[in-house]
Amino acid sequence: LSAQQTIPYLSMHPDGVCKLPGGLYTKTVEYEDINYSVASTEDQTAIFSGWSSFLNYFDSSLPFQLSFINRRSHSRSRYQVNIPKADDNYNSVRDEFTGMLKNQIAKSNNGIERSKYITFGIPAEGIAEARPRLERVEADVMGNFKRLGVPSEPMDGRARLALLHSQMHPGSREAFRFSWKDIPQTGLGTKDFIAPDSLDFRQSRTFRIGQYWGAVSYLQIMASELSDKLLAEILELDAEMTVTMHIQTVDQLKAIKTIKGKISDIGKMKVEEQRKAVRSGYDPDILPPDLITFSKDAAELLADLQSRNERMFLLTFTVVNLAPTRQRLENDVFTVGGIAQKYNCALRRLDWQQEQGF
């Protein structure tokens, strides 16, 4: 199996449409941060409401994923500081001030560049059918971001390939050199321009990509409510990683039917517990605490779906850690696991599924 075969897409088009196995076509939009944590309570409520409406836009036929990428920046910083020199006696001061600004920028993010993306996909028979539908979704997504006050930018094919190249070459200072004219001239495919020198998935809990070590984990959510601080704390770490939230909306009728079925099952369990209590001479109104909690949570969820126009989502939360040494990798994974544990979640390694997770 070659490194190119590990990269799962089938084709990338110049306009940013990517074809995946199973007839799924995707596009990606890069977006920036919004000052949520430092906003007032009223503003936080408004932002949260807007974000909820944004997520509710996606129906069951439109899977999407949120990607948060922390990568180590090198000499080519995305923040360019340049104070032009003048014909006077103050150029040494300008040089000193420029150096100070560059140092402050490096310290503020610990040399880590943090990027955020949303990728959405639709099933289609071909690119001609997929392209106009994806363009409509892209316009809606960017319109929703604009209403939230979040700057966003669609990614074309070269930008998506450059992003994949940076993911496939951690720690490398090599620039991404690619032009669509290179394809017919060289006979190479787009994967040949982004594939790493080597990928090694022979170990069960780690993998090698070039000279770097990597590990893929997933988040086991055991909390009844997931704190908005969990993701923020993970992304603030001084570590190279990719956090991905794969989200699939459940059809509304199916979701309501599923919850009603669960409530019916809980009702049967209540009756059975009450029968046991009567036979044993206990008060039948005293039920196990877990059963009471499950019943209350299910009723609240059904109310959200039926009367508050909320949606049910299936979520897969994965974390890909990358590090130059195995010890640093294990330390980074341990730190992420500690943050997850603080919010009543567990970080589980994908044993023998590192390639699929990556």
PLM features: residue spans?
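Extended, folded cores of ATP/NTP-driven motor/assembly subunits in large transport
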Residues: 1-358
